[in-house]
Amino acid sequence: MDEGVNTYEQLRVEGRENPNAGLLKDLAKSKQAVSALGLENLPASALNQLPYQVMASRGLDQPVQGPTAGQYGKGNYGVIVYYKTAALLRYLAGYLGQEKFDDAMRAYYTKWQFRHPYPEDMEAVFEESTGQKLDWFFREMLTNTREYNADIFATQTIGDQVKVLVRTDSPVLWPVPVSTVDAQGKVLQTLWTPPFGNPEDDAESQLNFRKENVAAVVVDAEYLTPQLNRRDDRLALGDGNFRRWEPVRVQPLASVERWDRSAINWMPVIGANTSDKFMLGAAFYNGLLAPKSCSTWPCPCTASAGTSSTASPRST
């Protein structure tokens, strides 16, 4: 874990000068790339999770703790040991609060400087410093490759409060950050659930927010958690069948998972056969960077022979 701790601290220091500090900081400098990939207004935490999400969505994820250096797959050593670990530590800091996290890190350094501690030693110091049980993080999240997911199950407005019911299908405990946002998507208030989860069924937790200026409630608005699916993270207040509707943008090549909008990607395609000769068209798809369990690639094409056209859909 030492590489991941170093990466976490490095990103914090670099972030003071560059808000986009991280693995893809050069990408964020290009306005063309930012627009093409739909990265506008995304925090660095979202970009730093992208390499891990690419691997995990293809079934190539590995635990932070457990494998030896030689047991990590091709490309996974840097992605998992450095950046996944750093991202999970940022998530823990969000849950504990930055001040409590920093106090625990100082206590850890003071006790174990010039020695070789193990993850259980770090857990013991953090639990003593914060007064909280953190086995859900050190013994579960760092040692497994589970796909964590949570959504907003229901909201109820009573007086000047918005009561929010958060749901997770995780079989193990984990805390979930939930935020209220205004009509422009600005975060108004963020609260964390206690660690919750159930191996037998969905688990639920209730949070109470201030009502003023709230347009929607969002799971993980700051992209701290290791979720892969962001499509069910937002629920607008009010009634109707479109409370989970997100704006859809058509973008070339690829896009990242966001809670505030969906994307349909496209790329040019060419083909040929004996009947239609040369064909030119476009493929439309979603989830190239983080593939879904079910996806469809419709490919409308125009043939050079005659005026007919053909479509070649592909589903997986």
Labelled PLM ranges:
Residues 1-169, 173, 183-186, 217:
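Hydrophobic alpha-helical and helix-loop surface patches within well-folded domains
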Residues 130-132, 213, 289-290:
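Alpha-helix capping and inter-helical loop/turn segments
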Residues 162, 183, 196, 212-216, ...:
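Cleavable N-terminal export/targeting peptides
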Residues 170-173, 211-212, 275:
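Short proline/glycine-enriched turn/loop motifs at strand-loop junctions of beta-rich domains
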Residues 177-179:
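Beta-strand signatures of extracellular beta-sandwich domains
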Residues 188-198:
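Solvent-exposed serine/threonine-rich low-complexity stretches and specific carbohydrate-binding patches
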Residues 200-211:
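Exposed aromatic-hydrophobic patches
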Residues 207-209, 220-316:
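Outer-membrane beta-barrel initiation region
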